[in-house]
């Protein structure tokens, strides 16, 4: 899997709106979703700049049917995996054990979450 370009927080929120869209999405729709989902109130020209940067970085593409409709070129799962790998390499010297340990020590977990995690661990042996 190739390394993805890093995204700024604004680009990432914009990309999340594209990933979450059930269909292709326009800049005005992204503006609305950014406000609804993240409380980010950007002008359409600002969001267009974010989308242009995402296009330049290879995250989105578009087609034009009166207006530009954007769609993801990279999946959310690919990006998450890339970010987790990058975090693991940089902060934990490649140790997945240290990464998981840091994640689990950070917050308290419900009994349900503990059971789910144990099932995931048990399934690794299968």
Regions found by a protein language model. Give the residues of each.
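Short alpha-helical segments that sit at the start of domains
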Residues: 1-17, 21, 79, 126
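Short acidic, hydrophobic short linear motifs in intrinsically disordered regions
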Residues: 24-34
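Short helix-coil junctions and helix-kink-helix linkers
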Residues: 32-42
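Short, hydrophobic-biased segments on the C-terminal half of alpha helices
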Residues: 48-52
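A short, conserved structural fragment
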Residues: 55-65
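Short, cationic-aromatic polyanion-contact patches
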Residues: 65-84
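Amphipathic alpha-helical dimerization/coiled-coil segments
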Residues: 84-125
């Amino acid at each position: 899997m190739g390394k993805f370009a890093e995204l700024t927080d604004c680009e990432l929120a914009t990309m999340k709106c594209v990933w979450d869209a059930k269909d292709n999405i326009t800049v005005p729709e992204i503006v609305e979703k950014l406000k609804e989902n993240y409380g980010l109130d950007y002008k359409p020209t600002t969001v267009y700049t974010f989308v242009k940067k995402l296009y330049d970085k290879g995250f989105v593409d578009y087609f034009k049917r009166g207006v530009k409709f954007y769609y993801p070129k990279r999946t959310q799962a690919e990006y998450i995996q890339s970010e987790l790998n990058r975090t693991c390499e940089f902060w934990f010297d490649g140790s997945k054990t240290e990464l998981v340990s840091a994640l689990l020590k950070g917050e308290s977990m419900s009994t349900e979450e503990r059971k789910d995690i144990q099932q995931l661990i048990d399934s690794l042996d299968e």
